[in-house]
Amino acid sequence: LSRGLGDVYKRQIKHGAVPRAVPGITVGHEMVGIVEETGRRVTKVKPGDRVTVNVETFCGECFFCKNGFVNNCTDQNGGWALGCRIDGGQAEYVRVPYAEQGLNKIPDSVTDEAALFVGDVLATGFWAARISEIGEEDTVVIIGGGPTGICTLLCVMLKNPEKIILCEVDPK
């Protein structure tokens, strides 16, 4: 199992910025793993498959899911559930609600470490670029040049804005 645990995530939980977080839950929402077993409705993956796990779980049926805002899924297991309300990637085993849309097979040619970027880091950048309605005459500002910021930069570049500004703290 490969997993990441971002500094922002840890600070948000520690300082109460995630009101739906359940005390005592094992954290971790960026993960890659091997399927041990599946529910009866899961057909896209099978035991033994290496998979990425989406950061958001979503029902696919509510208003928000049908309109592409899966992070606001109204189902009790929807939205940011893994590592927040359900044991996450730092646990030995993880139950993934709505696994049919929440797991993606990893090709053999892709390492676990590379695949780890898909579930949250790249997905965040892609989502930001997608919903921002960026036009070719726009200037886009990205705050933070860490892995998520760089993935956001790459996705924003696909929109061809006039200017892209990436802000990062000078470590000196």
Name each model-derived stretch.
Residues 1-5, 9:
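Single conserved hydrophobic/aromatic residue that forms the stacking wall/gate
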Residues 6, 55-58, 69, 99, ...:
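Glycine-rich beta-alpha junction loops
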Residues 10-14:
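Cytochrome P450 core scaffold surrounding the K-helix E-X-X-R motif
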Residues 149-150:
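N-terminal Rossmann-fold NAD(P) dinucleotide-binding loop
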Residues 61-143:
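NAD(P)H dinucleotide-binding glycine-rich loop of Rossmann-like/cofactor-binding domains
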Residues 3, 17-66, 107-109:
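Glycine-rich beta-strand-centered segment in the early N-terminal region that forms part
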